[in-house]
Amino acid sequence: MEGDIAQMGQFIGAGLAAIGSGAAAIGVGHVAGNFLAGALRNPSAAAGQTATLFIGIAFAEALGIFAFLVALLLMFAV
């Protein structure tokens, strides 16, 4: 009985940690959407901002990967 409760806690914790992957997708959408809005307002400055766009997307995706790793650790290592 106690093992079942511990396993249930692992699954709940992993599910909550996996929510971060969805938050990363929302973050990437915001970064790309704001870049597109700025590029449409000032097309001449858009070429200089693409590096910043990719850095922002990389940071947002890194948070999603960290959330996924935490979920895996909660599932299999704890």
Curated annotation (Swiss-Prot):
* Residues spanning the membrane: 11-31, 53-73
Tell me where it resides. Cell inner membrane
Annotated Pfam families: ATP-synt_C
Which residues carry the site feature described as Reversibly protonated during proton transport? Answer: E61
Q: Does the keyword Cell inner membrane apply?
A: yes
- State the annotated membrane topology for this chain: Multi-pass membrane protein
A GO molecular function held by the record = proton-transporting ATP synthase activity, rotational mechanism
> A cellular component term (GO) from this record?
proton-transporting two-sector ATPase complex, proton-transporting domain
Q: Which UniProt keywords apply?
A: ATP synthesis, Cell inner membrane, Cell membrane, CF(0), Hydrogen ion transport, Ion transport, Lipid-binding, Membrane, Transmembrane, Transmembrane helix, Transport
Q: Which InterPro entries match?
A: ATP_synth_F0_csu, ATP_synth_F0_csu_sf, ATPase_proteolipid_c-like_dom, F/V-ATP_Csub_sf
Q: Does the keyword Membrane apply?
A: yes
Give the main localization category: membrane
What family classification does the UniProt entry report for this protein?
A: Belongs to the ATPase C chain family.
Q: How does it assemble?
A: F-type ATPases have 2 components, F(1) - the catalytic core - and F(0) - the membrane proton channel. F(1) has five subunits: alpha(3), beta(3), gamma(1), delta(1), epsilon(1). F(0) has four main subunits: a(1), b(1), b'(1) and c(10-14). The alpha and beta chains form an alternating ring which encloses part of the gamma chain. F(1) is attached to F(0) by a central stalk formed by the gamma and epsilon chains, while a peripheral stalk is formed by the delta, b and b' chains.
Its biological purpose is as follows:
F(1)F(0) ATP synthase produces ATP from ADP in the presence of a proton or sodium gradient. F-type ATPases consist of two structural domains, F(1) containing the extramembraneous catalytic core and F(0) containing the membrane proton channel, linked together by a central stalk and a peripheral stalk. During catalysis, ATP synthesis in the catalytic domain of F(1) is coupled via a rotary mechanism of the central stalk subunits to proton translocation. Key component of the F(0) channel; it plays a direct role in translocation across the membrane. A homomeric c-ring of between 10-14 subunits forms the central stalk rotor element with the F(1) delta and epsilon subunits.
Q: What is this protein called?
A: ATP synthase subunit c
